[in-house]
Amino acid sequence: MGDAEAGKKIFIQKCAQCHTVEKGGKHKTGPNLWGLFGRKTGQAPGFSYTDANKNKGVIWTEETLMEYLENPKKYIPGTKMIFAGIKKKSEREDLIQYLKEATSS
């Protein structure tokens, strides 16, 4: 799939202001992403989500993240994530590869 090293750079540029990835990492404006894959939307313990996120009921996978990261507000109308999305498929693939490695043991 993607290139995790390139994905890490994308994460630092576009995501790290609001998210952490390490186990036990703190929530910032957005939730800590440890354990993201296989988790339902709106379920990171201790983070205050919008009803839209909690009610979406989707499991985060490579496929759902590909769609979400292209246009978050279209995928989950009512999300408080203020991020326009990543239009380039290759950049989304790189970011997802990085997240797969960085958010699990």
UniProtKB/Swiss-Prot annotation:
Binds 1 heme c group covalently per subunit. Phosphorylation at Tyr-49 and Tyr-98 both reduce by half the turnover in the reaction with cytochrome c oxidase, down-regulating mitochondrial respiration. Electron carrier protein. The oxidized form of the cytochrome c heme group can accept an electron from the heme group of the cytochrome c1 subunit of cytochrome reductase. Cytochrome c then transfers this electron to the cytochrome oxidase complex, the final protein carrier in the mitochondrial electron-transport chain. Plays a role in apoptosis. Suppression of the anti-apoptotic members or activation of the pro-apoptotic members of the Bcl-2 family leads to altered mitochondrial membrane permeability resulting in release of cytochrome c into the cytosol. Binding of cytochrome c to Apaf-1 triggers the activation of caspase-9, which then accelerates apoptosis by activating other caspases. The keyword Mitochondrion applies. The modification N-acetylglycine is found at residue 2. Heme c binds at residues 15, 18-19, 81. GO terms for cellular component: mitochondrial intermembrane space. One of its GO terms (molecular function) is heme binding. Coiled coil: none annotated. It comes from the Eukaryota. It holds the Pfam family Cytochrom_C. SUPFAM superfamilies: Cytochrome c. This is Cytochrome c, testis-specific. Keywords: Acetylation, Apoptosis, Electron transport, Heme, Iron, Metal-binding, Mitochondrion, Phosphoprotein, Respiratory chain, Transport. It is found in: Mitochondrion intermembrane space. The keyword Metal-binding applies. This is one of two isocytochromes C found in the testis. The other is identical with the form found in other rat tissues. These cytochromes are assumed to be located in the sperm. One of its GO terms (biological process) is hydrogen peroxide metabolic process. Belongs to the cytochrome c family. InterPro entries: Cyt_c-like_dom, Cyt_c-like_dom_sf, Cyt_c_1A/1B.
